[in-house]
Regions:
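Extended C-terminal subregions enriched in glycine
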Residues: 431-471
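Structural flexibility/helix-modulation signal
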Residues: 396-410, 414-419, 440, 494-496
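Short, conserved helix/loop micro-motifs enriched in His/Cys and acidic residues
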Residues: 419-435
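Short, glycine-/Ser/Thr-/acidic-enriched flexible segments
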Residues: 141, 314-317, 345-346, 438-441, ...
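Mature extracellular/periplasmic domains of secretome proteins
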Residues: 329-332, 420-423, 449-450
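Short acidic, Pro/Gly- and aromatic-enriched capping/linker segments at domain boundaries
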Residues: 495-510
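Serine endopeptidase catalytic core focused on the charge-relay Asp
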Residues: 202-205, 358-359, 405-417, 445, ...
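Flexible, low-complexity junctional segments that flank or bridge functional domains
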Residues: 2-390, 433, 471-490, 498, ...
């Protein structure tokens, strides 16, 4: 077998994955990890210290949800030894997920690291929020042998429950500060779940009730499978200069990659290599996609001779300079009289990339989002530590002042240098409209906030607002490093467990100065998806956005 054939076979195996029922009971997932009593208490103690001392949204979450995660974790210590491993990890995960913050998640034992549980179809919603309809928009035909279960069929039941009720029930287990954002995430996680950041499905298979295109009721049984989608060559790397400047829903990013593996396999297979720009074509006919060496994060095509379309899939990248350079190149190849920028389901990533991109579409001077830490003895010691001088010293004085002033937070300061946000200037001369939804999160929220606060153009929102992720997220390993040498240095999380945490709280700037993003999001012009949007490549949505561009040109 030649190299190309081996590569093709490897891609097929990656897309096929393994049955979850086999992986969780066999040796594929690395076998079970038993946490002894001491390890369980160590996990709880580290989480209590970290959340109480560094979690940026703790006062707001306590007020919003009338619950106290610190007390809940403390009480869990009393019964931790009586629980099974599955019960213990689910209990910890439920407490942390109860914060409704996708930045702050418990990571269970490392046996399921990088794994995503998938069903072989994608379900999407259309119509008004009060009376939604659900249909299958994409199918992995290699994993479905029912010819009547095809894109376009309406979904009516999930394991015997009415489908809308199943979505609502699952939304109760999801992150999201608003009911609509929890429903959006539930709809996604019904068929795609990042197992590193949450428990696996209870069932090994699901029974999906649907109505065929002929109107007949039918059912199909589909097993859960597990994939390892990996990361693109352009993705962010731990330990890089950008590692502490992330704002991302890591679970949603893993799911995005898994969807790409299943439904855009050729693109997934090609994004593991870095290609120089001089090997990339710079031509595309109307309706065709432009070639790009950063196709995991960017995609662009001319919709007509007057309107271009830019898809920003994610800000998960390591090099913001390369991102901005490629973005400028793509903008120059699109029609210059109108642009639609689509950030739906963008899970975030590098803060620098999102905030620097705004300048390309406006003559305004961009003021970046500002971030602050919660004022506690722990964060004061972190900011005063010589180890953290470059990263945290700017907040040190206001953290010290908070002792006497009673302020809950340090002074908010930008993570992106304001000069970087204005070093290129406007590169796209025409009017632009941006599109977001309830799964646009984190750095996607920051882009949307900057878009609105600098009056760059209309913001169209599918759903009430963006996903409302307002923080800079750190991992447990990064937090442990930053606490090194202080009185609060934690031990290492045992058995490959860990967590992510919202460390610095985001505050809007410019016209939205002082408004938090967490749990609120960025609202825009409301839009309800149609069946034609789901089945005909966003036909009505693009027409709606084009009409807004036409108004801007008048």
């Amino acid at each position: 077998m030649n190299g190309a054939a081996r590569s093709a076979e490897a891609v097929r195996r990656a897309r096929r994955g393994v049955l979850m029922s086999e992986a969780l009971t066999g040796s594929r997932a690395g076998g079970p990890v038993d946490l002894d009593g001491g390890q369980r208490l160590q996990i709880l103690d580290i989480l209590v210290t970290s959340i109480a001392g560094t979690y940026a949204h703790l006062p707001a979450k306590r007020a919003a949800y009338a619950s106290d995660p610190v007390q809940a974790l403390t009480l869990l210590r009393r019964r931790a030894a009586d629980l099974s491993d599955i019960e213990f990890n689910r209990a910890v995960s439920a407490i942390v997920t109860g914060l409704r913050d996708a930045h702050t998640r418990y990571i269970g034992p490392s046996t399921l690291r990088d794994q995503v549980a998938v069903l072989p179809f994608l379900v999407e919603q259309y119509g008004p929020e009060s009376r939604p309809k659900y249909l299958v928009s994409k199918i992995n035909t290699d994993a479905v042998d029912d010819p009547e279960f095809q894109p376009g069929v309406e979904l009516e039941a999930w394991n015997g429950a009415p489908f809308a009720r199943a979505v609502e029930n699952h939304a109760d287990l999801e992150t999201g500060g608003r009911p609509d954002s929890r429903r959006s995430r539930a709809l996604e996680s019904l068929t795609f779940r990042a197992l590193e950041y949450g428990p696996p499905p209870d069932e090994h298979w699901v029974i999906v009730g649907y109505r065929t295109k002929r109107g007949r009721k039918a059912e199909i049984r589909l097993p859960w499978r597990m994939l390892t989608p990996g990361k693109a060559a352009t993705a962010g790397e731990p330990g890089s200069r950008a590692a502490l400047k992330q704002a991302s829903d890591l679970a949603a990013e893993a799911v995005r990659r898994a969807k790409k593996l299943v439904f855009a396999t050729d693109l997934w297979a090609s994004d593991h290599e870095r290609r120089p720009v001089d090997e990339v074509s710079d031509k595309a006919e109307v309706g065709e996609w432009l070639d790009s060496p950063m196709q995991d994060t960017l995609a662009a095509r001319p919709l007509s001779r007057k309107v271009g379309y830019l898809r920003i899939w994610s800000f998960d990248l390591d090099d913001d300079d390369a991102f901005i350079t490629e973005l400028i190149r793509l903008l120059g190849l699109l029609p210059q009289t109108g642009l639609i920028i689509d950030l739906r389901a963008n899970p975030g990533g590098l803060i620098w990339a999102a905030e620097r991109a705004l300048q390309l579409f406006t003559d305004a001077t961009i003021q970046p989002t500002r971030f602050s830490m919660i004022a506690t003895p722990l964060t004061r010691q972190m900011a005063d530590s010589p180890f953290n001088r470059l990263e945290l010293e700017a907040w040190s004085q206001s953290l010290q002042d908070a002792v006497s002033t009673g302020e809950l937070y340090a002074q908010p300061l930008p993570l992106t240098d304001p000069s970087w946000c204005n070093d290129q200037g406007r590169m796209y001369p025409g009017p632009s409209v941006a599109v977001v939804d309830a799964n646009t999160y984190s750095s996607g929220d920051l882009f949307a906030a900057g878009w609105v606060d600098h009056s760059i153009g209309p913001l169209v929102s599918v759903g009430q607002a963006t996903g409302a992720g307002g923080a800079n997220v750190w991992t447990s390993a990064q937090l442990r490093d930053a606490l090194s040498g202080t009185d609060h240095q934690p031990g290492r999380m045992p058995a490959g467990t860990g967590f992510t945490i919202a460390f610095r709280r985001a505050i809007r700037s410019a016209a939205g100065d002082g408004i938090p993003i967490e749990d609120l999001g960025i609202p825009g012009i409301p839009y309800e998806m149609t069946k034609d949007d789901l089945m005909k490549s966003n036909k009505d949505l693009l027409a709606f956005c084009s009409s807004l561009l036409g108004e801007a040109n008048e």
